[in-house]
């Protein structure tokens, strides 16, 4: 990127927008089943489960942002809250909810808006539910690179 006196230029910003709109979307994991994330069991409702690695470090080698979470499977009828984290410090970058009940199976692509994540960052996730029964969610992520 071009900088004048160390400051971002209008050209820099236009380039980022151009790349965002015209680069192809990606999915992770690709050509594989989604990653399973599990809620806690026996520690209380709406308590986040253990962090699970969705995208390992050094996998996405360009800056990126996440636009959708693909919910591939939900284990039980419940409300699920998913939290995404990035980097070694596990900084929260997004949070969404999905419901599975007698009328909705909960499998869908949920829009999410994350900040631009640094290249080579890992992405981890955790879920919570009101049931406290160890529910699971299988997910993959749709993202764009810059």
Which ranges hold each PLM region?
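Beta-strand-centric surfaces of beta-sandwich/beta-rich domains
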Residues: 1-146
């Amino acid at each position: 990127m071009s900088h004048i006196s160390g400051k971002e230029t209008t050209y820099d910003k236009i380039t980022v927008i151009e790349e965002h709109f015209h680069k192809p979307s990606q999915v992770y994991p690709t050509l594989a089943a989604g990653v399973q994330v599990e809620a806690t069991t026996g520690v209380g409702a709406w308590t986040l489960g253990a962090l699970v690695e969705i995208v390992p470090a050094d996998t996405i080698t360009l800056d990126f942002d996440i636009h959708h979470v693909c919910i591939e499977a939900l284990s039980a009828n419940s409300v699920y809250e998913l939290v995404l984290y990035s980097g070694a410090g596990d900084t929260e970058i997004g949070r969404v909810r999905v419901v599975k009940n007698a009328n909705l199976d909960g499998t869908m692509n949920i829009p999410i808006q994350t900040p631009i994540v640094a290249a080579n960052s890992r992405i981890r996730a955790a879920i919570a539910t009101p049931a406290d029964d160890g529910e699971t969610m299988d997910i993959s992520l749709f993202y764009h690179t810059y």
